[in-house]
Every structure is written in C-alpha cells, then in structure tokens.
C-alpha cells in the first residue's frame, strides 16, 4: 500500500500521480481516512497542478469500487450531466434535458446530488417537485424501464461522499470531485453528454472516457457554461470507436437564435421549479426551450442522428407538446408508491 504522505508530497511539488497513487489517494478519501485540513490542501494542490486523465481514470475506478452496484439495463442507456462549478447559476438545464430526452424515447439515468457550488443542484430541484430521490436500485431500474428515466442519488450509492462534503463546502470552488461526478454514474450509461466548466478540461475528460471504455460520448464546453451554449460557441470532443474528434458548434448549427446567458439565470429551488415546470408543460420561454433542446439534440447525435438542426426541431416539438411534464409526473408517482 502506498503511503498517503508520499502521495501528498508529490502533489505539493506539483508532480503528476501514477495510476496506482491516484487510486490509493481516492480510496483513502472515500473511506474517510484523510483529515479535513489535509483534504482541502490536497484538493487545492490537484487543482493548481491540473488533473491528468490517468489520475481521473484511477480516481473513477477507486470510487466505483466503493459504490453500491446498480442492476444492468438492457440496451443503450444515456447520461446528460455537467461538472457544475461554472459559476453562472443557470436553470437546471441538464436535469430538464434528461426528462425531455426520456419523453423522446431515450433511456436516461441521471446521477447527482444536492447543491455544492450552485444555488440549486439537480436533486434539490427534483425534491422540490416531490420526487423521492432515495429509491432502491431495483426500483430505479424498474422506473427506467417503465418511463425511460431514473434518478440515482449520490449518497444512496456511495455514503463515502459524506467524508468530503465539508471540504468541498469550505473551498467554495470547483475541485476534482466536480470532474469525477459525471463519470461515476452507478448505472454506467454507454452514451453520455458531459459538460465541463473549463475548456482545458475537454481533452482530459474525453481521454478519461476512452480509458473507461465508454461507447459513444461528447464532452462539451459552452463558452463559460458546462453544457451546450445558446449564447456563443460550444467546443466539443466527440468519442467514437476509441477516437476523439474535436470541433466547434454555434447556435446557427442547431437552427436557433442566439440568446444571452442572463436569459438562463436561475434562482432558489422553488424559483427553478416554476421555470422548469413551465418548460415541461410546453409553456416555457424561447431561450429556455432552446437551451434544453440543443443539449438533447447533441445527445441524439450519439444515436447516429447527425443532423443537429433536425434534432433540435424534433425536440422543440416534443417540449411544446407538454408531454414532458407527464413523464416527470409518472416518475414522481412511481417514486412515492
């Protein structure tokens, strides 16, 4: 076993960790074997050094090895998730996109927790709607099979995350755990859209996904946002057949107008709840609908639907039908049986 001191010394010298060292470090983290002052300094050192794809992949495996198993789902399973930490406090676009994608017929497993760095995390929003976020894995699997949508609450699958919650709160900034969050979905989706909070993270995240054997994925950075942008360019790394292709898209590629970031500002869970409810009922503002639609359109690309404009129009029609709220209501009812 590699000692914590030797690992920490390397980090303080801003040296990259080996796969084994990173695995051991995050095994210590998740088992609560690192004191709070050391946690904050280690996370800060990793951030200053910049995390490598090897360190991230090793951390993912360590966390998976300490996570409750989720029953295997037949066929394709999608994930739409952001790292968080972009600092803009927009409405919960990835959560809404997951509900819309499920309504469009794609099975989506949404893994997340309550807010760490924003005013309203994805599961804060779900709770405000009345979703029981602590379903057992077999119940969540059945929900996925019935309604194409399942919510996996982080603390339910890995209670070790409680050991690092205080350090993340103290730091009040994004850390490697923002990067790890989208990668440790216990349902193990094979088609994922991951938004990152920094352009510098696109390639490390994409390389990590290749190392983890993900079938199809896109990593996106939306000019300040950890999702596909409607205000400016979105930088993309697409993964197919273990190859990474980098490109850039803009609102015009989706056939939509350009909007301002302020058009997407969110608030407290109750405020977000009302905004999201209106979107799902087909009564949302144009900017809100567009933001959700482009993110679902990008997911559809992973199912060999390459025409982003057509994808976006299809999604906008589904949103405007109001059927998406029915999907959420079915999940709410199922989760409270």
Curated annotation (Swiss-Prot):
Reaction(s) catalysed (UniProt annotation): N-(5-phospho-beta-D-ribosyl)anthranilate + diphosphate = 5-phospho-alpha-D-ribose 1-diphosphate + anthranilate
Binding of Mg(2+) 1, residues = 94, 227
Q: Which residues bind anthranilate 2?
A: 168
Domain of life the protein comes from: Bacteria
Q: What is its EC number?
A: 2.4.2.18
Binding site residues for 5-phospho-alpha-D-ribose 1-diphosphate: 82, 85-86, 90, 92-95, 110-118, 122
Asked if Calcium is a keyword of the record, the answer is no
List the keywords (alphabetical): Amino-acid biosynthesis, Aromatic amino acid biosynthesis, Glycosyltransferase, Magnesium, Metal-binding, Transferase, Tryptophan biosynthesis
Q: Does the keyword Magnesium apply?
A: yes
Q: Top enzyme class of this protein?
A: transferase
Which residues take part in binding anthranilate 1?
A: 82
Query: Any one cellular component term from GO for this entry?
Result: cytosol
Under the subunit heading, UniProt states: Homodimer.
The protein in question is named Anthranilate phosphoribosyltransferase
Gene that encodes it:
trpD
